[in-house]
Amino acid sequence: MLEQTSYRVERISELIRRELTLLLKTTTKDPRLSGVMITDVLASRDLSSAKVFYTVTKEDRTVVEPILSKASGFFRSRLSKTLDLRHTPALGFIFDSASNTGARIEQLLSKL
């Protein structure tokens, strides 16, 4: 059975994605996070947690993953200051392998 998300949850997920992208560009000072791109955010229905999907352009995924996990509290506190929510969702960072798969398929198709 498909789980339907409400318009509010989708809207908040998009707001979180935009704010995290902005935070990564402006406030993080770690150069290893400069190649991180937020691809999608899926918030739970009760907005207690959010899965943040990301890709990496420069650094290795194994280097960036623990840094993002460690900085999730920092990102959550910054989001609580900018978003007008009663409770800010807990953030879980997940590597988005779908975008890499799509790029690989495009590369293979261009060779044909």
UniProtKB/Swiss-Prot annotation:
One GO location term (cellular component): cytosol
InterPro entries: KH_dom-like_a/b (IPR015946), RbfA (IPR000238), RbfA_dom_sf (IPR023799), Ribosome-bd_factorA_CS (IPR020053)
Main location: cytoplasm
Keywords of the record: Cytoplasm, Ribosome biogenesis
Subcellular location(s) of the protein: Cytoplasm
Sequence similarity: Belongs to the RbfA family.
Name by which UniProt lists this protein: Ribosome-binding factor A
Species the sequence originates in: Ruthia magnifica subsp. Calyptogena magnifica
